[in-house]
Amino acid sequence: EIAPRAAAELYSLLCDAMVAADTKAIDALLTDYCVLTHMTGYPQPKVEWLGDIANGAMRYHDHEVVSVQPDTIAGFPVVRGRTRTTATLWGGRGTWNLQIVGYVVPDADPDTERNPTGFRFSRLDASTW
């Protein structure tokens, strides 16, 4: 189980790194096998997602955190974060009420400079709320 403070910090680090287009920081928050499932249903491997951020195909301009809650789904610890996010995704710009459910695992290779939480996301599921 992830403590509320660590959950909020992990989610905040992810949102801030997305807006900064800091792919190294995002990488430090995700496991090697992490997949982001977009609200369209497209499952995007981490390497592809980070590539799209690096080349500007996906630009996160701003976010306002509305809520961050630790939770469990089928016994797995998750962080359920809700933001109002402005982004340009593959050419289309908009502002969305974005929910990301991040499945959390202990960090087997801690990078305390970029990720001091002791956890990483192994899966991210995006939807609207």
Q: Which sequence ranges carry the predicted segments?
A:
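Short, low-complexity N-terminal intrinsically disordered segments enriched in polar/charged residues
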Residues: 1-33, 64
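Hydrophobic pocket/interface hotspot
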Residues: 14, 26, 34, 49, ...
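A short gly/proline-enriched turn/hairpin at secondary-structure junctions
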Residues: 33-44, 55-59
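A generic structural motif
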Residues: 37, 86-88, 105
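Surface-exposed, charged secondary-structure patches
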Residues: 51-97
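Short beta-strand edge/turn micro-motifs at domain boundaries
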Residues: 78, 96-129
